[in-house]
UniProtKB/Swiss-Prot annotation:
Subunit description: Homodimer; disulfide-linked. Interacts with FAM20A; probably forming a heterotetramer of 2 subunits of FAM20A and 2 subunits of FAM20C. Interacts with COPII components SEC23A and SEC24A; transport of FAM20C from the endoplasmic reticulum to the Golgi is likely to be mediated by COPII vesicles.
PANTHER family for this protein: DENTIN MATRIX PROTEIN 4 PROTEIN FAM20, EXTRACELLULAR SERINE_THREONINE PROTEIN KINASE FAM20C
Reactions mediated catalytically: L-seryl-[protein] + ATP = O-phospho-L-seryl-[protein] + ADP + H(+); L-threonyl-[protein] + ATP = O-phospho-L-threonyl-[protein] + ADP + H(+)
Protein name per Swiss-Prot or TrEMBL: Extracellular serine/threonine protein kinase FAM20C
Organism annotation: Mus musculus
Glycosylation sites: N96
Effect of R544W: Mislocalization of the protein from Golgi apparatus to endoplasmic reticulum
Entry keywords, A to Z: ATP-binding, Biomineralization, Calcium, Disulfide bond, Endoplasmic reticulum, Glycoprotein, Golgi apparatus, Kinase, Manganese, Membrane, Metal-binding, Nucleotide-binding, Phosphoprotein, Secreted, Serine/threonine-protein kinase, Signal-anchor, Transferase, Transmembrane, Transmembrane helix
Encoding gene, per UniProt annotation: Fam20c
Length: 579
């Protein structure tokens, strides 16, 4: 008898559970069906996301609006579906840096054809599978102030007004932008649900950006992502980049996890607006140099080197480093209290000096002896904005041809073979296109910083080999201001190739009126952890710049100007004229 009662009780529980599930599904679906049936325009509803590439365009907001809809209020907030498409919100610590996410990259979108008001919508034009324009030309663009401090005394403002910093990229097509989101795919509106999401309206409401201000209301990390194209990580005068730098230094941190892999401790921080950044804590003071007996592969990763690398990359006009900003972090409130990573949480302790410390898990320097301690719980670090998740925008990792041996005694092939470049130039992708010139740009960039740790680089898989290379992981730069590591310049010495635009900008930055050290000091002074670089590091930049220019002159004397300097400015001029 007792067993029969137990079985009946279990059946009753199961029935109640199934009824609750059915009721939940009905409550969730009925308001949406009712809203679609009563839509004033008579159109069937669509909870699909707007193509992200169109969202980036100036004319997208107007094309998306409907008669009778207001441009302001809650409707102007970004579509949560689009946010879900463009960044993975997984709690996986390796999110954005691995392929763990199961979300699939949407296929290319059809251009939306909107009929004039009062007319029937036209049938969509036939698709040209080979090549079609992404955005309509919005007409003359207003003059946008250059990034950085403005004013009559700003060296940066004057630099960015120079003709060398005014060249245009070719007109963009669907194949040239990173994101072409298929608007026909239906996404779960609960995927990016967050009770703290600002500007939310009634439960179940659709969030379709409308009106002129819609794109301006997108989070700055999203503007950064949808602005990536074949030619640049971000455009020269994109105001979202400086806004993103401010976000990195001020946005509320909602969760923290350790980044898997890597030799030293790094944390993945997620913000209230769903943006994510990689946090590298301070390990050395500004004036400390790398000990002379340290190998390059056991050197500390410096947070201020990551910050300075972004600013140097932008001054050189490469624009291949994701935005990085400094920030003071409260280790108790902004790391320990918000992390769900038990392995990280367990490493917190109070030092004999009553400071909060932690050490995490990693290959090097993750122990009680190398703990990171606050004062008493404040710690300085860098926050690098994440690139789009690998499940959405795959990246290809390439072994640097001039990679070091990472061995205490062995040397790499390029260190013993003076003709090594000839072998490289016969190997894809260096045998065609501009990849070898990209390597030369990266060489100059690394030499100016003193970075010997460039073992790999990455590109966006969508763009194939005809695209820029991304300058990631610059934490081992700016380690020695009293020593110039000439071996970093081996690719330039062996290949004797450089872009004309790069060469001219280096010459410009060597002039007194555009002195590189002064430009860097001005660019870095607005960071929250300024001064970012020790003065002797700034002076080393000018000294190393002269060494690079002398290396190019030596190549020109040996091989001739036309063989050494690749004229890429003629191509830029043609693109500017066409546009």
């Amino acid at each position: 008898m007792k067993m029969i009662l137990v079985r009946r009780f279990r059946v009753l529980i199961l029935v109640v559970f199934l009824l609750a599930c059915a009721l939940h599904i009905a409550v969730d679906l009925l308001p949406k069906l009712d809203r679609r049936a009563t839509r004033s325009s008579g159109e069937p509803g669509c909870s699909c996301a707007q193509p992200a590439a169109e969202a980036a365009g100036p004319g997208w907001a107007q094309a998306r609006s409907r008669p009778g809809e207001s441009a302001g209020g809650d409707a102007g907030w970004p579509n949560k579906h689009t946010l879900r498409i463009l960044q993975d919100f997984s709690s996986d610590p390796a999110s954005n840096l691995t392929s763990h996410s199961l979300e699939k990259l949407p296929s290319a979108a059809e251009p939306v054809d909107h009929a004039p008001r009062g007319q029937e919508p036209r049938s969509p034009p036939p698709r040209d599978p080979a090549h079609r324009p992404l955005l309509r030309d919005p007409g003359p663009r207003p003059r946008v102030p250059p990034p950085g401090p403005s004013g009559d005394g700003s060296l940066l403002a004057k630099l960015f007004e120079h003709p060398l910093y005014q060249g245009a990229v070719p007109p963009l097509t669907e194949d040239d932008v990173l994101f072409n989101v298929n608007s026909d795919i239906r996404f779960n509106p609960k995927a990016a649900e967050n009770p703290d999401w600002p500007h939310e309206g009634a439960e179940g409401a659709e969030f379709l950006p409308t009106g002129e201000a819609a794109v301006n209301l997108y989070p700055n990390w999203l503007k950064f992502h949808i602005g990536i194209n074949r030619y640049e990580l971000y455009s020269r005068h994109n105001p979202a980049i400086d806004a993103l730098l401010r976000d990195l230094g001020s946005q509320k941190i909602t969760s923290v996890a350790m980044k898997s892999g890597g030799t030293q401790l790094k944390l993945i921080m997620t913000f209230q607006n769903y943006g994510q950044a990689l946090f590298k804590p301070m390990k050395q003071t500004r004036e400390q140099e790398t000990p002379p007996d340290f190998f390059y592969f056991s050197d500390y990763e410096r947070h201020n080197a990551e910050i300075a690398a972004f600013h140097l990359d932008r001054i050189l006009d490469f624009r291949r480093v994701p935005p990085v900003a400094g920030r003071m972090i409260n280790m108790t409130k902004e790391i320990r209290d918000v992390t769900r990573d038990k392995k990280l949480w367990r490493t917190f302790f109070v030092s004999p000096a009553n400071n909060i410390c932690f050490y995490g898990e990693c290959s090097y320097y993750c122990s009680t002896e190398h703990a990171l301690c606050g004062r008493p719980d404040q710690i300085e670090g860098s926050l690098a904005a994440f690139l789009p998740d690998l499940s959405l925008a795959k990246r290809k990792t390439w072994r640097n041809p001039w990679r070091r041996s990472y061995h205490k005694r062995k040397k790499a092939e390029w260190e013993v073979d003076p003709d090594y470049c000839e072998e490289v130039k016969q190997t894809p992708p260096y045998d065609s296109g501009h990849r070898i010139l990209d390597i030369m740009d990266m060489t100059v960039f690394d030499f100016l910083m003193g970075n010997m740790d460039r073992h790999h680089y990455e590109t966006f898989e969508k763009f194939g080999n005809e695209t820029f290379i991304i300058h990631l992981d610059n934490g081992r730069g700016f380690g020695k201001y009293s020593h110039d590591e000439l071996s970093i310049l081996a690719p330039l010495h062996q290949c004797c190739r450089i872009r004309r635009s790069t060469y001219l900008r280096l010459q410009l930055l060597a002039k007194e009126e555009h002195k590189l050290s002064l430009l860097m000091a001005e660019s870095l002074q607005h960071d929250k952890v300024a001064p970012v670089l020790y003065q002797l590091h700034l002076e080393a930049l000018d000294r190393r710049l002269r060494i690079v220019l002398q290396a190019v002159r030596d190549c020109v004397e040996k091989d001739g100007l036309s063989s050494v300097v690749e004229d890429d400015l003629a191509t830029e001029h043609r693109a500017s004229t066409e546009r």
